[in-house]
């Protein structure tokens, strides 16, 4: 689907095989998990610096916003719009690390790919572009997880259809609208 310089030199498919840290792309899923655990878009979270000392490792963890600006108490909806890192960490803490990791599997992410530490709220997990798109499509599809398809149909040299995909519809109303649109004169 997405390749490099030459398919003959490398059949590596960047859309389906290239796992990369997803960064802030994870935030809609973390926020969704927070809503599932009882937060609302009107919930107020403190956007303030975090300085967490780990005595066992002797290292402090200091996630920061980018830019390093903090708004203090902020509504969840505004924090998402501004992509506030420390709010994402706070929501993960409020909803629970394991609960959030389990919730992310509803979007098609493999549990084995989700680190069980707070950095997951900042996008430290690695996923392929296809996995991220599939996850985002759950939001677009009203909560339905569907498997993406790449080929809609196969035609012969005369334009005759040899094969057509039969995708699962995310909502039955959409399917009915599609059928009524094609049956009208």
Protein language model features and the residues they cover:
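A penicillin-recognizing enzyme superfamily signal
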Residues: 1-15, 26, 78-82, 126-185
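Proteins synthesized as precursors that undergo proteolytic processing into mature forms
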Residues: 3, 7-10, 35, 42, ...
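Active-site SXXK
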Residues: 19-46, 79, 135-139
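Secondary-structure capping and boundary motifs in well-ordered enzyme cores
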Residues: 18-23, 68-72, 76, 80, ...
């Amino acid at each position: 689907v997405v390749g490099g310089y030459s398919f003959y030199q490398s059949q590596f498919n960047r859309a389906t095989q290239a796992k990369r840290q997803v960064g802030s792309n994870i935030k809609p899923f973390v926020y969704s998990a927070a809503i599932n655990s009882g937060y609302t878009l009107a919930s107020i979270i403190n956007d303030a610096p975090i300085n967490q000392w780990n005595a066992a490792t002797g290292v402090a963890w200091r996630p920061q916003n980018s830019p390093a600006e903090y708004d203090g108490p902020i509504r969840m909806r505004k924090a998402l719009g501004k992509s506030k890192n420390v709010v994402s960490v706070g929501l993960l803490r409020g909803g629970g690390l394991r609960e959030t990791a389990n919730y992310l599997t509803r979007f098609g992410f493999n549990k084995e790919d989700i680190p069980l530490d707070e950095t997951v709220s900042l996008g430290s997990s690695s996923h392929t572009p296809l996995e991220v798109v599939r996850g985002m499509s759950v939001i677009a599809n009203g909560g339905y997880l569907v498997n993406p398809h790449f080929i809609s149909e196969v035609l012969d040299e005369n334009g005759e259809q040899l094969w057509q995909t039969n995708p699962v519809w995310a909502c039955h109303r959409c399917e009915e609208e599609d059928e009524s649109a094609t049956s009208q004169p």
